[in-house]
């Protein structure tokens, strides 16, 4: 039954029945742990891989001895980096040793290898002042994969692929004649026996003795035209290097370099682990019948007698005894199973080797050799350390190749199994650390080439490590990765949930991953191995669906990059769920029967029912309680954080739940956040881990609290911890970040306690929206098609008001004609326009600005015309005339307005780092308060979204019997067809809870039942069906039927009408067609497309049509004259010839067609072409005003809106449907690319939107 639960500072009434057996892990540990691994081990591995660099003669050796990140010399703190557009990084110092083998001289030096970006505590990076996130990538794990296809006759043809981390691929395939072929590195195929011969089995008999009798192998031998090892080698060489003269030596060295050279071929730790797991004997021979006695080679004892069935445990012992092959009987046929001969070292070595830190299996022949040659413990350990690269090879070895062939031969007999590439046991995660490591490796290998070249050129006596090493390639590789990799994304900072989700995102796209076009349905689909690892619900709609996923709540990533999920261990004999928790990867879980978290247990953990519902692979079975292996730890284990925040998720249709998860991430932080009355209990954990809340570093007592700062006196040593709060800072998405203290002076705080609320949080819980009194009722058609009718109260009381901070910057640069100047002295500007500008030429903080107002006064020198000799003489006599300047001030763009909250000025004199050519940089921050308005998009948490259609006076809204009016009316028709019934349950429970004064926690899949909701409604004194009489606010009459009324949690989404509305009178035109550009960012016109033209044609609106095709679009002269006529109030003149028609004629003439244009009297019309200068001279001359309007305004990225809508962009498509009008934009030489970056950033960061 319902019970109170303490969440931070708030008590919630919880309906959860399952008590969580384990804590949820830190939600951003996937980022933090991976980066820490990189600093600890990843860098070390890369330096080990590249060591030593020798020159071509081998007498100079360069080695990287040690490295350290110099944390004391970090230039700027995180906050300063954001202000100064700097990168948060620490210098990487590497000790390098150079040895001259001729003279024996050794030089050691510490070399600076560039600044290395550091991860903040929140799991992000600050790159050039912008907060970025590195998204983890899901890729296919290196290893060996078996598959089959079915040919025309219905026969299974098996194939295999050996995929390394980097290096040549090996592919096996069978044709319908049962011949097995191999492809080496995607070349033409050869019979597989050629590869086996080249690896050392020359004659046919040797092959058959080793691999055993097999028809497919015999068929391959017959197809093979080589008979000895040498012929096999030459045949492979001819295929791989056609046209070169083949010799046995060159063939051997070619194969060695392709497969057995650690620099060229890398399996990686994961690849080696997967190889050993797949090719080991134990899984292949378990439950099979032995054809011969199996004898332990080291002791001589018989482990399995002929004809005996091999149990699972016995199979493990055989594997670890170092037995290479076992013959088994399948339907009275003898099949030989060959392993790659790797064993568990602890089963072979008589003493404890845990201090050697060997976690993988080791190669048995190499280990045997060490054990046979040495006897005492210390020497054996020394030798094992020395031979680690042979014991655990990073490349493949011959034994691996033989074992893969043997596996291929065994598959038709049911020995082994084929792989499913979409199974999470075969897909792994590359997180930040590994992605960085790969980038760093690329940089180092480029550097290695430079070092080798310099070794040969420079004088060997005076050479030092510093002279050899060029750090440019390394720094460039890292910079390129953070700046432009598809996986380095501009952080989605709309609200704390979107930050958290972004850090937990898993993408299958990116370098080395899939591409959107190539990804089929199978990759995108939900797989049974996703359970508890990847959320089946949260993924974007659109082309990226299923390729971008989210980590489940309890999931974590293991050292190999596989995702694990926790389960409770079940004591099978007693059918009792223990308290022991173990993490399982997807392929470990596949052998188990797993009970649900909601399965009823008694107080000692015994299953109540004799029969239990369990999951096994993709099936749901009912089995006796004594057969259950594992049990889920929590009901929310299967979903991601955003999805776990939807109450009554189990009552929603999956596609609506998907929209609900995605829309919560778009909720704008409101002025006064309010935690949901009906929550799911995960809100607190999500807010704390997202990194927007300041937490106490140590336990202590609060000694001082203000809006900007909190001080805590530490218990441990009596010192003071200071916490600065962020006030009105701009986020990446222009929302407002503001922190407010929630502790009082004298309060005792414990370590990690939340001290202040951030954006969208309330008492430390995520609060994305507001609890609203609403009813499901139609009202005069204003709720048609999901629209929402809202009360004026929501506007007046600032319920859905949000703050938005925009940043504008202005640079003063050096131009060819002299430096630009930031000044108050601007030509042709009235004093009135400068009333808020200070003497520096910069607007004051607190000023209210509207579009077109000056923010920063700036003048740029104008080019002087060539002077005549007389003018130069006069100039020389009478002194210099003042040089001409033009006004290039920064103004508020169209459609923007607000209050200046902050100004930042950076100059060279103050020692600020600026881009080359920039002398001064000014940034202005404008804050807007946006109230809710018609056209804004709102949504609930269940995918129920809509646009506001009308704001009704409070007195006209339907009202309750106690006189309270509703705040929102939703359409009841939006519920049944969408099947998101969760919203109705939420409304009922919220109605009861608000009356009882409760905040509720109803966890997903474990929440309040219908009966419990009814009980709550009755307890609160309402009808058990949750309906009530509602009165019409205009007439006071009751509506005919009872209406469902209650409290729903509603979010205001980031799609605000103010950002979308747009109009233009004149503006920029496309260069070739002279038609207006499209889109708000380009300040474009409205497109009047093909179908719209048909509509006018259908009604015979000839004049309108002519106007749209000419003066409102690309009749260059006509549009100027028309503008003039409208302003002066005259009649619109006759239109001329559209520019795009001239372009068409020119294109036909370019095809050597002599096209002439004739008028109705068959006279030729001359099509005058305008040069750019003539177009520029066409200026609208409006009588009585000195201002003239240029025809071709320059594109400024900041322009947004004008009131009058005149111009129309006409559709012109070339044959292949490519839109010309976006082709070229008019620009002037001083237009800086940087200004466009604001528009581009979002696209970079978010492939998915």
Curated annotation (Swiss-Prot):
Q: Which UniProt keywords are given for this protein, alphabetically ordered?
A: DNA-directed RNA polymerase, Nucleotidyltransferase, Transcription, Transferase
GO MF: DNA binding; DNA-directed RNA polymerase activity; ribonucleoside binding
Against PROSITE patterns, the record matches this protein to:
RNA_POL_BETA
Catalytic activity from the UniProt record:
RNA(n) + a ribonucleoside 5'-triphosphate = RNA(n+1) + diphosphate
- State the source organism's domain of life: Bacteria
Q: What class of enzyme is it?
A: transferase
One cellular component GO annotation, for this chain's record? DNA-directed RNA polymerase complex
Task: Give the taxonomic lineage as stored in the record.
Answer: Bacteria, Bacillati, Bacillota, Clostridia, Eubacteriales
What name goes with this protein? DNA-directed RNA polymerase subunit beta
State the family it belongs to. Answer: Belongs to the RNA polymerase beta chain family.
**Subunit structure, per the record?**
The RNAP catalytic core consists of 2 alpha, 1 beta, 1 beta' and 1 omega subunit. When a sigma factor is associated with the core the holoenzyme is formed, which can initiate transcription.
InterPro entries tied to this protein: DNA-dir_RNA_pol_bsu_external_1, DNA-dir_RNA_pol_su2, DNA-dir_RNAP_su2_dom, DNA-dir_RNAP_su2_hyb_sf, RNA_pol_bsu_bac, RNA_pol_bsu_CS, RNA_pol_bsu_protrusion, RNA_pol_Rpb2_2
Q: What does this protein do?
A: DNA-dependent RNA polymerase catalyzes the transcription of DNA into RNA using the four ribonucleoside triphosphates as substrates.
What are the EC numbers?
Answer: 2.7.7.6
Which one GO biological process term can you cite for this protein? Answer: DNA-templated transcription
Q: Which CDD domains match?
A: RNA_pol_B_RPB2
């Amino acid at each position: 039954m319902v019970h109170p639960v303490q969440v931070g500072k708030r008590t919630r009434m919880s309906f959860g029945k399952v008590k969580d057996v384990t804590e949820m892990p830190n939600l951003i540990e996937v980022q933090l742990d991976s980066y820490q691994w990189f600093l600890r081990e990843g860098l070390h591995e890369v330096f080990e891989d590249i060591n030593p660099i020798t020159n071509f003669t081998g007498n100079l050796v360069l080695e990287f001895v040690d490295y350290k990140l110099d944390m004391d010399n970090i230039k700027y703190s995180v906050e300063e980096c954001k202000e100064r557009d700097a990168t948060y990084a620490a210098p990487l110092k590497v000790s390098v040793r150079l040895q001259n083998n001729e003279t024996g001289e050794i030089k050691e030096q510490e070399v600076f290898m560039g600044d290395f970006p550091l991860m903040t505590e929140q799991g992000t990076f600050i790159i050039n002042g912008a907060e970025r996130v590195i998204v983890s990538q899901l890729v296919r794990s290196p290893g060996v994969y078996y598959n089959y296809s079915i040919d025309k006759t219905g026969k299974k043809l098996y194939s295999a692929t050996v995929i390394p981390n980097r290096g040549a691929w090996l592919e096996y395939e069978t044709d319908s004649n049962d011949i097995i072929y191999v492809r080496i590195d995607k070349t033409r195929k050869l019979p597989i026996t050629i590869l086996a011969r080249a690896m050392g089995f020359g004659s046919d008999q040797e092959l058959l003795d080793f691999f055993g009798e097999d028809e497919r192998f015999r068929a391959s031998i017959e197809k093979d035209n080589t008979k000895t090892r040498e012929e096999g080698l030459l045949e492979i060489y001819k295929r791989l290097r056609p046209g070169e003269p083949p010799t046995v030596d060159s063939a051997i060295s070619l194969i060695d370099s392709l497969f057995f050279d650690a620099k060229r071929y890398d399996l990686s730790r994961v690849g080696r682990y997967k190889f050993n797991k797949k090719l080991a004997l134990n899984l292949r021979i378990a439950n099979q019948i032995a054809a011969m006695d199996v004898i332990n080679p080291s002791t001589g004892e018989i482990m399995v007698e002929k004809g005996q069935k091999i149990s699972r445990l016995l199979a493990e012992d055989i594997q670890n005894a170092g037995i290479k092959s076992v013959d088994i009987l399948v339907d009275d046929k003898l099949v030989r199973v060959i392993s790659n001969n790797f064993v568990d070292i602890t089963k072979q070595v008589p003493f404890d080797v845990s201090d050697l830190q060997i976690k993988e299996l080791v190669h048995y022949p190499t280990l045997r050799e060490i054990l046979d040659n040495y006897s005492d413990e210390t020497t054996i350990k020394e030798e094992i350390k020395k031979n680690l690269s042979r014991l655990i090879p990073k490349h493949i070895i011959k034994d691996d190749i033989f074992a893969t062939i043997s596996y291929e031969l065994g598959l038709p007999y049911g020995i082994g199994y084929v792989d499913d590439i979409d199974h999470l046991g075969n897909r792994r995660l590359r997180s930040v650390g590994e992605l960085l490591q790969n980038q760093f490796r690329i940089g180092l290998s480029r550097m290695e080439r430079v070092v080798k070249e310099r070794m040969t050129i420079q004088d060997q006596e005076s050479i030092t490590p510093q002279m050899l090493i060029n750090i440019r390639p390394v720094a460039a590789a890292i910079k390129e990765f953070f700046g432009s990799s598809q996986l380095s994304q501009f952080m989605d900072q709309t609200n704390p949930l979107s930050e958290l989700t972004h850090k937990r995102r898993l993408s299958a796209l990116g370098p080395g991953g899939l591409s959107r076009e190539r990804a089929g349905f199978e990759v995108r689909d939900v797989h049974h191995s996703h359970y508890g690892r990847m959320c089946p619900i949260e993924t974007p709609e659109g082309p990226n669906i299923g390729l971008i996923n989210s980590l489940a709540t309890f999931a974590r990533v293991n050292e190999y990059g596989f995702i694990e999920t926790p389960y409770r261990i079940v004591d099978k004999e007693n059918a009792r769920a223990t308290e022991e928790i173990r993490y399982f990867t997807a392929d470990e879980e596949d052998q188990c029967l797993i009970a649900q978290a909601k399965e009823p247990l008694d107080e000692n953990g015994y299953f109540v029912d004799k029969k239990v519902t369990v999951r096994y692979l993709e099936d749901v079975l009912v089995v006796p309680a004594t057969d259950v292996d594992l049990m889920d730890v929590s009901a929310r284990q299967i979903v991601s954080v955003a999805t776990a925040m939807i109450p009554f998720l189990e009552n929603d249709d999956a596609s609506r739940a998907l929209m609900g998860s995605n829309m919560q991430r778009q909720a704008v932080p409101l002025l006064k956040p309010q935690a949901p009355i009906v929550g799911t209990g995960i809100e607190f954990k999500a807010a704390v881990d997202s990194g927007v809340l300041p937490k106490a570093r140590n336990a202590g007592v609060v000694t001082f609290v203000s809006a900007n700062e909190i001080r805590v006196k530490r218990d441990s040593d009596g010192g003071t911890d200071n916490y600065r709060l962020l006030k009105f800072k701009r986020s990446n998405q222009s929302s407002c970040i503001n922190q407010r203290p929630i502790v009082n002076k004298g309060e005792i705080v414990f370590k990690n306690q939340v001290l202040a609320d951030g954006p969208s949080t309330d008492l430390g819980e995520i609060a994305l929206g507001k609890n609203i009194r609403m009813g499901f009722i139609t009202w005069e058609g204003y709720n048609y098609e999901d629209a929402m009718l809202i009360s004026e109260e929501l506007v007046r009381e600032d319920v859905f008001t949000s703050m938005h901070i925009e940043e504008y910057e202005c640079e003063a640069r050096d131009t060819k004609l002299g430096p630009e100047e930031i000044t108050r002295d601007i030509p042709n500007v009235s004093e009135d326009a400068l009333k808020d500008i200070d003497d520096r030429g910069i607007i004051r903080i607190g000023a209210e600005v509207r579009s077109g107002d000056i923010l920063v006064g700036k003048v740029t020198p104008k080019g002087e015309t060539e002077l005549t000799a007389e003018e130069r003489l006069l100039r020389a006599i009478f002194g210099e005339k003042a040089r001409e300047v033009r006004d290039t001030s920064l103004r508020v763009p169209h459609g923007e307005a607000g209050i200046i909250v902050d100004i930042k000025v950076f100059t060279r004199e103050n020692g600020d780092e600026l881009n080359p050519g920039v002398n001064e940089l000014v940034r202005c921050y404008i804050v807007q308060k946006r109230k809710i308005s018609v056209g804004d998009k709102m949504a609930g948490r269940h995918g129920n979204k809509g646009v506001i259609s009308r704001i009704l006076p409070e007195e006209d809204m339907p009202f309750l019997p106690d006189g309270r009016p509703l705040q929102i009316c939703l359409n009841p028709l939006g519920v049944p067809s969408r099947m998101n019934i969760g919203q109705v349950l939420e409304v009922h429970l919220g109605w009861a809870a608000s009356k009882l004064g409760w905040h509720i926690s109803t966890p997903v899949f474990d929440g309040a039942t219908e009966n419990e909701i009814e009980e709550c409604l009755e307890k609160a004194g309402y009808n058990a069906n949750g309906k009530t009489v509602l009165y019409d606010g205009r007439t006071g009459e009751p509506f005919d039927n009872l209406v469902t009324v209650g409290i729903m949690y509603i979010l205001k989404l980031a799609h605000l009408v103010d950002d979308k509305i747009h109009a233009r009178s004149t503006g920029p035109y496309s260069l070739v067609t002279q038609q207006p550009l499209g889109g708000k960012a380009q300040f474009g016109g409205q497109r009047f497309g093909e179908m719209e033209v048909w509509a006018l044609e259908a009604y015979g609106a000839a004049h309108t049509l002519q106007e749209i095709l000419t003066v409102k679009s690309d009749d260059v002269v006509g549009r100027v004259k028309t503008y003039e006529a409208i302003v002066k109030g005259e009649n619109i003149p006759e239109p001329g010839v559209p520019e795009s028609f001239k372009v068409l004629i020119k294109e036909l003439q370019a095809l050597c067609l002599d096209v002439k244009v004739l008028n109705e009297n068959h006279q030729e019309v001359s099509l005058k072409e305008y040069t750019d200068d003539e177009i520029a001279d066409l200026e609208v001359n409006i009588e009585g005003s000195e201002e003239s309007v240029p025809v071709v305004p320059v594109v400024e990225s900041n322009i947004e809106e004008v009131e009058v809508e005149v111009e129309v962009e006409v559709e012109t498509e070339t044959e292949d449907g490519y839109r010309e009008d976006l082709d070229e934009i008019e620009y002037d030489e001083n237009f800086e690319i940087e200004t466009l970056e604001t528009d581009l950033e979002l696209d970079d960061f978010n492939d998915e939107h």
